[in-house]
Protein backbone atom coordinates (compact mmCIF):
# COMPACT_ATOMS: atom_id res chain seq x y z
CA UNK A 1 0.00 0.00 0.00
CA UNK A 2 1.44 3.34 -1.10
CA UNK A 3 1.66 6.58 0.83
CA UNK A 4 -1.25 8.02 -1.15
CA UNK A 5 -3.47 5.08 -0.14
CA UNK A 6 -2.47 5.49 3.50
CA UNK A 7 -3.36 9.18 3.48
CA UNK A 8 -6.68 8.51 1.76
CA UNK A 9 -7.66 5.84 4.26
CA UNK A 10 -6.74 8.14 7.14
CA UNK A 11 -8.93 10.89 5.69
CA UNK A 12 -11.84 8.48 5.21
CA UNK A 13 -11.37 7.18 8.74
CA UNK A 14 -11.36 10.67 10.25
CA UNK A 15 -14.49 11.62 8.31
CA UNK A 16 -16.27 8.47 9.47
CA UNK A 17 -15.32 9.04 13.11
CA UNK A 18 -16.89 12.51 12.97
CA UNK A 19 -20.02 11.08 11.37
CA UNK A 20 -20.39 8.35 14.00
CA UNK A 21 -19.92 10.89 16.79
CA UNK A 22 -22.86 12.80 15.32
CA UNK A 23 -24.88 9.58 15.73
CA UNK A 24 -24.10 9.41 19.44
CA UNK A 25 -20.98 7.24 19.52
CA UNK A 26 -18.35 9.03 21.60
CA UNK A 27 -16.30 6.28 23.24
CA UNK A 28 -12.56 6.97 23.09
CA UNK A 29 -11.68 3.26 23.48
CA UNK A 30 -14.06 2.33 20.68
CA UNK A 31 -12.54 4.76 18.19
CA UNK A 32 -9.00 3.83 19.25
CA UNK A 33 -9.76 0.19 18.41
CA UNK A 34 -11.36 1.22 15.12
CA UNK A 35 -8.24 3.18 14.16
CA UNK A 36 -6.04 0.24 15.15
CA UNK A 37 -7.74 -2.37 12.96
CA UNK A 38 -7.30 -1.66 9.21
CA UNK A 39 -10.56 -2.60 7.48
CA UNK A 40 -8.80 -2.89 4.12
CA UNK A 41 -6.98 -5.90 5.60
CA UNK A 42 -10.31 -7.75 5.66
CA UNK A 43 -11.50 -7.18 2.08
CA UNK A 44 -10.27 -8.82 -1.12
CA UNK A 45 -8.15 -6.82 -3.56
CA UNK A 46 -10.98 -5.84 -5.97
CA UNK A 47 -12.70 -4.08 -3.06
CA UNK A 48 -9.60 -2.60 -1.44
CA UNK A 49 -10.48 0.98 -2.36
CA UNK A 50 -14.00 0.53 -0.96
CA UNK A 51 -12.88 -0.66 2.49
CA UNK A 52 -14.29 2.40 4.28
CA UNK A 53 -17.32 2.93 2.05
CA UNK A 54 -20.70 2.48 3.69
CA UNK A 55 -21.87 -0.35 1.45
CA UNK A 56 -22.15 -4.12 1.38
CA UNK A 57 -18.89 -5.73 0.22
CA UNK A 58 -18.78 -9.32 -1.12
CA UNK A 59 -16.35 -11.79 0.45
CA UNK A 60 -15.57 -15.47 -0.04
CA UNK A 61 -18.17 -18.28 0.10
CA UNK A 62 -20.94 -16.05 -1.24
CA UNK A 63 -21.01 -14.05 2.00
CA UNK A 64 -20.59 -10.32 2.52
CA UNK A 65 -19.41 -7.61 4.90
CA UNK A 66 -22.24 -5.53 6.30
CA UNK A 67 -22.35 -1.77 5.79
CA UNK A 68 -19.66 -0.13 7.89
CA UNK A 69 -22.00 2.24 9.74
CA UNK A 70 -24.25 -0.68 10.68
CA UNK A 71 -21.27 -2.61 12.00
CA UNK A 72 -20.09 0.30 14.12
CA UNK A 73 -23.54 1.06 15.53
CA UNK A 74 -24.00 -2.60 16.49
CA UNK A 75 -20.56 -2.93 18.09
CA UNK A 76 -21.04 0.31 20.00
CA UNK A 77 -24.39 -0.94 21.32
CA UNK A 78 -22.63 -3.96 22.83
CA UNK A 79 -20.91 -1.60 25.30
CA UNK A 80 -17.83 -3.81 25.42
CA UNK A 81 -15.44 -3.81 28.38
CA UNK A 82 -12.01 -5.36 28.75
CA UNK A 83 -13.22 -8.02 31.20
CA UNK A 84 -16.01 -9.38 28.97
CA UNK A 85 -16.23 -12.74 27.21
CA UNK A 86 -17.85 -12.40 23.80
CA UNK A 87 -19.51 -14.91 21.47
CA UNK A 88 -19.89 -14.07 17.78
CA UNK A 89 -22.00 -16.20 15.46
CA UNK A 90 -20.86 -15.60 11.89
CA UNK A 91 -17.17 -14.74 11.64
CA UNK A 92 -17.41 -13.51 8.07
CA UNK A 93 -14.40 -11.40 7.14
CA UNK A 94 -13.24 -11.21 10.76
CA UNK A 95 -13.20 -7.40 10.87
CA UNK A 96 -15.77 -7.06 13.64
CA UNK A 97 -14.18 -9.97 15.47
CA UNK A 98 -10.86 -8.13 15.53
CA UNK A 99 -12.50 -4.92 16.75
CA UNK A 100 -14.28 -6.74 19.57
CA UNK A 101 -11.05 -8.48 20.56
CA UNK A 102 -9.44 -5.06 21.10
CA UNK A 103 -12.26 -4.10 23.44
CA UNK A 104 -12.83 -7.30 25.43
CA UNK A 105 -11.05 -10.12 27.26
CA UNK A 106 -11.74 -12.93 24.80
CA UNK A 107 -13.83 -13.45 21.68
CA UNK A 108 -15.10 -16.84 20.57
CA UNK A 109 -16.25 -16.66 16.96
CA UNK A 110 -17.83 -19.44 14.91
CA UNK A 111 -18.64 -19.91 11.23
CA UNK A 112 -19.95 -22.72 9.03
CA UNK A 113 -17.40 -22.12 6.27
CA UNK A 114 -13.92 -23.64 6.52
CA UNK A 115 -12.55 -21.05 4.08
CA UNK A 116 -13.74 -18.10 6.17
CA UNK A 117 -12.46 -19.67 9.39
CA UNK A 118 -8.99 -20.27 7.94
CA UNK A 119 -8.76 -16.82 6.34
CA UNK A 120 -9.83 -15.16 9.59
CA UNK A 121 -7.20 -17.06 11.58
CA UNK A 122 -4.52 -15.91 9.14
CA UNK A 123 -5.63 -12.28 9.42
CA UNK A 124 -5.70 -12.35 13.22
CA UNK A 125 -2.23 -13.90 13.28
CA UNK A 126 -0.88 -11.26 10.89
CA UNK A 127 -2.25 -8.49 13.12
CA UNK A 128 -0.91 -10.15 16.26
CA UNK A 129 -4.34 -10.60 17.86
CA UNK A 130 -4.17 -13.52 20.29
CA UNK A 131 -7.41 -13.35 22.32
CA UNK A 132 -9.68 -14.82 19.63
CA UNK A 133 -10.85 -18.44 19.43
CA UNK A 134 -12.11 -19.35 15.94
CA UNK A 135 -14.22 -22.49 15.49
CA UNK A 136 -15.90 -24.07 12.49
CA UNK A 137 -19.29 -25.22 13.75
CA UNK A 138 -22.98 -24.86 12.95
CA UNK A 139 -23.80 -21.55 14.60
CA UNK A 140 -27.54 -22.04 14.16
CA UNK A 141 -27.42 -24.57 17.00
CA UNK A 142 -26.86 -23.56 20.60
CA UNK A 143 -23.25 -24.01 21.74
CA UNK A 144 -23.71 -24.84 25.43
CA UNK A 145 -20.23 -26.36 25.74
CA UNK A 146 -18.72 -22.88 25.40
CA UNK A 147 -20.18 -21.64 28.68
CA UNK A 148 -21.81 -18.27 29.35
CA UNK A 149 -20.95 -14.92 27.78
CA UNK A 150 -21.20 -11.27 28.72
CA UNK A 151 -21.94 -10.29 25.13
CA UNK A 152 -23.34 -12.23 22.17
CA UNK A 153 -23.45 -10.93 18.59
CA UNK A 154 -25.35 -13.00 16.02
CA UNK A 155 -25.01 -11.81 12.42
CA UNK A 156 -27.51 -14.13 10.67
CA UNK A 157 -31.11 -13.04 11.12
CA UNK A 158 -33.99 -15.10 12.50
CA UNK A 159 -37.75 -14.72 12.62
CA UNK A 160 -38.27 -15.23 16.35
CA UNK A 161 -36.67 -14.39 19.68
CA UNK A 162 -33.31 -16.19 20.15
CA UNK A 163 -34.36 -17.79 23.45
CA UNK A 164 -31.74 -20.55 23.47
CA UNK A 165 -28.92 -18.02 22.98
CA UNK A 166 -30.35 -15.61 25.52
CA UNK A 167 -29.91 -18.35 28.11
CA UNK A 168 -26.15 -18.20 27.46
CA UNK A 169 -25.99 -14.60 28.67
CA UNK A 170 -24.40 -13.78 32.01
CA UNK A 171 -26.12 -11.33 34.38
CA UNK A 172 -26.46 -7.91 32.71
CA UNK A 173 -25.37 -9.52 29.46
CA UNK A 174 -26.32 -8.15 26.05
CA UNK A 175 -27.26 -10.00 22.86
CA UNK A 176 -27.79 -8.33 19.48
CA UNK A 177 -29.41 -9.94 16.43
CA UNK A 178 -31.59 -8.93 13.48
CA UNK A 179 -35.13 -10.23 14.03
CA UNK A 180 -37.67 -10.55 11.22
CA UNK A 181 -38.75 -12.54 8.14
CA UNK A 182 -36.06 -14.30 6.09
CA UNK A 183 -37.04 -12.52 2.88
CA UNK A 184 -38.12 -9.16 4.29
CA UNK A 185 -37.01 -6.28 6.45
CA UNK A 186 -35.62 -7.17 9.87
CA UNK A 187 -35.02 -5.10 12.98
CA UNK A 188 -31.63 -5.16 14.69
CA UNK A 189 -32.66 -5.89 18.27
CA UNK A 190 -30.74 -5.51 21.52
CA UNK A 191 -31.59 -7.82 24.44
CA UNK A 192 -30.31 -7.14 27.95
CA UNK A 193 -30.48 -9.77 30.69
CA UNK A 194 -31.71 -8.45 34.04
CA UNK A 195 -32.09 -11.30 36.49
CA UNK A 196 -34.47 -13.84 34.98
CA UNK A 197 -36.00 -11.45 32.44
CA UNK A 198 -34.81 -9.74 29.27
CA UNK A 199 -35.29 -6.15 28.21
CA UNK A 200 -35.64 -5.62 24.48
CA UNK A 201 -34.96 -2.49 22.41
CA UNK A 202 -35.11 -2.02 18.63
CA UNK A 203 -32.22 -0.26 16.87
CA UNK A 204 -32.64 0.01 13.08
CA UNK A 205 -33.88 -1.92 10.04
CA UNK A 206 -31.69 -4.18 7.88
CA UNK A 207 -31.89 -7.04 5.40
CA UNK A 208 -29.48 -9.72 6.62
CA UNK A 209 -29.17 -13.33 5.53
CA UNK A 210 -30.94 -15.86 7.78
CA UNK A 211 -29.25 -18.81 9.46
CA UNK A 212 -28.18 -21.65 7.17
CA UNK A 213 -28.16 -24.91 9.10
CA UNK A 214 -25.21 -27.28 9.03
CA UNK A 215 -21.51 -26.97 8.21
CA UNK A 216 -20.62 -26.22 4.59
CA UNK A 217 -19.35 -29.46 3.02
CA UNK A 218 -17.18 -27.92 0.29
CA UNK A 219 -16.26 -24.30 1.04
Per-region residue spans from a language model:
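Class I SAM-dependent transferase core
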Residues: 1-88, 95-99, 103, 116-130, ...
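Conserved nucleotide-cofactor-binding alpha/beta core module
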Residues: 79-199
Amino acid sequence: MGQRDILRFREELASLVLKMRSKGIDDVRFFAAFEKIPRQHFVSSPWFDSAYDNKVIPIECGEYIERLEEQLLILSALSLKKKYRVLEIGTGSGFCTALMACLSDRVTTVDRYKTLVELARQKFQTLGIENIVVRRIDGSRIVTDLGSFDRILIWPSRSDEPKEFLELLAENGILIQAIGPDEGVQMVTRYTRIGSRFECSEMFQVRYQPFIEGIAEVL
